[in-house]
Amino acid sequence: MAKWPGAYPVFIDQAKGARFTDVDGNSYIDFCLGDTGSMTGHSPDATVAAIREQAGKGITAMLPTADAAIVSAELANRFGLPLWQFTVSATDANRHVIRYSRLLTGRSKIVVIDRCYHGSVDETFATLDAIGNTVAREGNIGAPVALDHTTRVVEFNDIAGMEKALAHGDVAAILMEPAMTNVGIVLPQAGYLEAVQELAKKYGTILIIDETHTISVGPGGMTADRGLKPDFLTIGKAIGGGIPTGTFGMTQVIADSIKKMVELEIIDTGGIGGTLAGNALSLAAMRATLTHVLTNENFDRMIVLGTRWSDGVDAAIAEFDLPWSCNRLGARGEYIFGKIAPVTGADANNSGDFELEQYLHLRMLNDGFLITPFHNMALMCPDTTSADVDAHSAAFRKMCAELVEA
């Protein structure tokens, strides 16, 4: 709540599609969409119908439904990994695959990208200090151990830094987004992702790709779009239409290795899974969302609108010669307070301007638009319209004009 702009948070009354209404009756165009949790649009009809039906048939029984097989097959088709396990969130999915990676490699450490976010996973709240040492990020409260015991941090797009981190021979896994989305959008440079894959193979390190946000590029995320071959893939949020859920996929080789190493009689003490993981309600939501909402046709529309949104922002920035820029990732776009697009998480973090950001968010809110409060990101959903995007472009242009005049 503290991240929202203004003295008081907006309390929501109801939301549908690309809009929501607050308790005072004000209507907003939603470009935040629950920070991707509602990338489907709020309460998509197909997902709501599936939830209603399943709620009457049983919410959870700690046994699989037919939807488990249907959803697994759909995920395999989209992302290219044959086997899937379900969790309650993408955070849990990341926790579980880190544990599996340590089991499979016999190694203790993971590599993460500076200024990454993968949910509330203890090992990921690390950054680099001024001399390149791994330290806890500011605000990381109650860390169970010093972060340099569990983690090595590497800058995004730094292939030499990645090899240096892996060369110690003690890294179980690399956990990364294929494009950074939680410190602003930072895109991979040509050849970077392919080089990371090759380094993971060279040093016997497991590659985990987190597609929770980068699914904005299409039905199979950047994994399908770039032809990536991760060992594990994690995702959550949007695939359930807003119902808490997560999942992780794995290669057949990984699955076979796990089967050989995990003893059935002690599997419930392995730190993997949860009583509500893969419950019937969340699987019904995933099936309906993947089948009827996050479709090729809807992604095609959303990506066109994402381009239109970014073009509108770029036009205003150019017209008023502001030292800003705009990055885009499929259906997602972001204003950046710097003329040069960031190459690393540190670049993106250093381009931040807290007071300007607070003003911009509050101004957009007063003009009837909600954007993601942690930075300046906007996301399109199947219900977003060209008129919504053009209205934002007009409001953004007016704001830029007033800032220049001031």
Question: Where in this protein do the model-derived segments appear?
Answer:
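Conserved N-terminal phosphate-binding loop of PLP-dependent enzymes in the Aspartate aminotransferase
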Residues: 1-406
